[in-house]
C-alpha cells in the first residue's frame, strides 16, 4: 500500500501530481467515485472522519470495521481492485470528546486509533489540536504534538500486531476553520504562515523522537495547512496563489512532505489545479459531492412533478423538509436568519447540512419512490435538457443512459472529474 508515498515521491520529483480524498459515506457518492476511478484506472482514496465513524458508531452508526466492510463490498460489486483502494481516517484524536477531561478524551482517542488501524485504514490524520474540558484554550504546539505522538505510537503498535508490518502513512496538523465548512459568513481567510507550519512540524518531530518514533518520519507525508480556501453557506473564498507563495515555497525544503488542503469544495477547476501545483497536493472533497447528489435529486423531483400525477409523486422535497424540521439538530446551530433564509439554507447551502439526513428511513423511502416513478418509462429528453443540461449532452451523444441512477451518478462524477484533472500532473 505505497500509493501515497509514491505519489509524494513523484510530486517531489516535479510531476505536479496529487490525489483527491473522497470524504463521504453516501452509497451513491461512493459508487460514483469507485466507478470514476475504475474508468480512469487510478487509485481511490476514501476517508471517514472521526465524527462519521468511530469505535462507538459515530453519526453514521458505523465502526471503522463496518465502514471498511461497506466500502470493500461496494468496490467488489463494481469489480474495483481492493489494492487500488486507500482508506483514510480524518481528524483522528479527541475531537468527539472535547467535553471530557483530557485524560479520558485521550483514552477514547487511543481506542479510536486502534479501531481505525485494526480495520485496515492506512492513511491516518492525527489531529489533537482541540482543547478538552480541563485544557487551556488554545493548546500549545507542544501539547498538540505530544498527544499526536502518543497516538502515532498506538497506531504503529496496532498495525504491527494486526498486519505484521508498520506501513501506515500519516498526516499531521490542522486547518484553522472547523471541519466541514465555516459556520459564519466569510470574506477573507488567514493563510497559514511558514513560521507556524515550521513550528508545527518541529514540535511533532521532537515529540515523535521522544516516543522513539524517529524512523516513521518519512511516512509523515503531509501537513494540513490553510492555503486560503473555504466556503460558507452561499460564498466561496477562492484560492489566491500570491497569498500562499511563501507557504508553498517553505515545503520545498522538506524531502518527503507535501501539504493537505481541507475544504477545497466549490473551488474552480483552475484553483484546484493551482493548489496541486503549489504543493497542496492532497485535496479533500466532501460536501461538494453530496451537494451534487442533492442537485441531481432535486432536478429529478422536478421532472417527476411534470410527469406523474401529484397523488402518485414521491414528495421527496417535502419529506426532506419535514424530517429536517422535525430533527433540526444537524442544521439549527449552522443556519441563521428569518424563516425563509433558513428554508433556503436547508435546501441549498454550500455547507450541505442536508447530507446528514439522507440515511433517514422516510427520506430513503421517498428517494426509492422517486427512482421507481422515473424508471417505469423513459424520461423525455426535453425534460433532461431542462433540469440536467450537462447530462443531456452526454445522453444525446450516447455516452450516458438516461435512467435516474445513471443521471445522479454522472452528475456527481462531473465534480470528481475536476479533481481528477487537477491531480493528474504532467
Curated annotation (Swiss-Prot):
One of its GO terms (biological process) is D-tagatose 6-phosphate catabolic process. GO terms for cellular component: plasma membrane. InterPro entries: Aldolase_TIM (IPR013785), GatZ/KbaZ-like (IPR012062), GatZ_KbaZ_carbometab (IPR050303), TagBP_ald_KbaZ (IPR023435). It holds the Pfam family GatZ_KbaZ-like. SUPFAM superfamilies: Aldolase. Pathway: Carbohydrate metabolism; D-tagatose 6-phosphate degradation; D-glyceraldehyde 3-phosphate and glycerone phosphate from D-tagatose 6-phosphate: step 2/2. Disulfide bonds: none annotated. Forms a complex with KbaY. Belongs to the GatZ/KbaZ family. KbaZ subfamily. Component of the tagatose-1,6-bisphosphate aldolase KbaYZ that is required for full activity and stability of the Y subunit. Could have a chaperone-like function for the proper and stable folding of KbaY. When expressed alone, KbaZ does not show any aldolase activity. NCBIfam families: agaZ_gatZ, PRK15458.1. This is D-tagatose-1,6-bisphosphate aldolase subunit KbaZ. It comes from Escherichia coli O157:H7.
Amino acid at each position: 500500500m505505497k500509493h501515497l508515498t509514491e505519489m509524494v515521491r513523484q510530486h517531489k520529483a516535479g510531476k505536479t501530481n496529487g490525489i483527491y480524498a473522497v470524504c463521504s459515506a453516501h452509497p451513491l457518492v461512493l459508487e460514483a467515485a469507485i466507478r470514476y476511478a475504475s474508468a480512469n484506472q487510478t487509485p481511490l482514496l476514501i476517508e471517514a472522519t472521526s465524527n462519521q465513524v468511530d469505535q462507538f458508531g459515530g453519526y453514521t452508526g458505523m465502526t471503522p470495521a463496518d465502514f471498511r466492510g461497506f466500502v470493500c463490498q461496494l468496490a467488489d460489486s463494481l469489480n474495483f481492485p481492493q489494492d487500488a483502494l486507500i482508506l483514510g481516517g480524518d481528524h483522528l484524536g479527541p475531537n468527539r470528546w472535547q467535553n471530557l477531561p483530557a485524560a479520558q478524551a485521550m483514552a477514547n482517542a487511543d481506542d479510536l486509533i486502534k479501531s481505525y488501524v485494526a480495520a485496515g485504514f492506512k492513511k491516518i490524520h492525527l489531529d489533537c489540536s482541540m482543547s478538552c474540558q480541563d485544557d487551556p484554550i488554545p493548546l500549545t504546539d507542544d501539547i498538540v504534538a505530544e498527544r499526536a505522538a502518543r497516538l502515532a505510537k498506538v497506531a504503529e503498535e496496532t498495525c504491527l500486531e494486526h498486519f505484521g508490518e508498520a506501513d501506515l502513512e500519516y498526516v499531521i496538523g490542522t486547518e484553522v476553520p472547523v471541519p466541514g465548512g465555516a459556520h459564519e459568513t466569510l470574506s477573507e481567510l488567514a493563510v497559514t504562515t511558514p513560521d507556524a507550519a515550521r513550528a508545527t512540524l518541529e514540535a511533532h518531530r521532537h515529540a515523535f523522537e521522544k516516543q522513539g518514533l524517529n524512523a516513521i518520519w518519512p511516512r509523515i507525508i503531509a501537513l494540513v495547512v490553510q492555503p486560503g480556501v473555504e466556503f460558507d453557506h452561499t460564498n466561496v473564498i477562492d484560492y489566491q496563489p500570491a497569498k500562499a507563495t511563501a507557504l508553498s515555497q517553505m515545503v520545498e525544503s522538506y524531502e518527503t512532505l507535501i501539504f493537505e488542503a481541507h475544504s477545497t469544495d466549490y473551488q474552480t477547476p483552475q484553483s484546484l489545479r493551482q493548489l496541486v501545483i503549489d504543493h497542496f497536493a492532497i485535496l479533500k472533497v466532501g460536501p461538494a459531492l453530496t451537494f451534487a447528489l442533492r442537485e441531481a435529486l432535486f432536478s429529478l423531483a422536478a421532472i417527476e412533478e411534470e410527469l406523474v400525477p401529484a397523488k402518485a409523486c414521491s414528495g421527496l422535497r417535502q419529506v426532506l423538509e419535514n424530517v429536517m424540521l422535525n430533527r433540526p439538530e444537524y442544521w439549527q446551530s449552522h443556519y441563521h436568519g428569518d424563516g425563509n433564509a433558513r428554508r433556503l439554507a436547508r435546501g441549498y447551502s454550500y455547507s450541505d447540512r442536508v447530507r446528514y439526513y439522507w440515511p433517514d428511513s422516510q427520506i430513503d423511502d421517498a428517494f426509492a419512490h422517486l427512482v421507481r416513478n422515473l424508471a417505469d418509462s423513459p424520461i423525455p429528453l426535453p425534460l433532461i435538457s431542462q433540469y440536467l443540461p450537462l447530462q443531456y449532452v452526454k445522453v444525446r451523444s450516447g455516452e450516458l443512459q438516461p435512467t435516474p441512477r445513471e443521471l445522479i451518478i454522472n452528475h456527481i462524477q462531473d465534480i470528481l472529474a475536476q479533481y481528477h484533472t487537477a491531480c493528474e500532473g504532467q
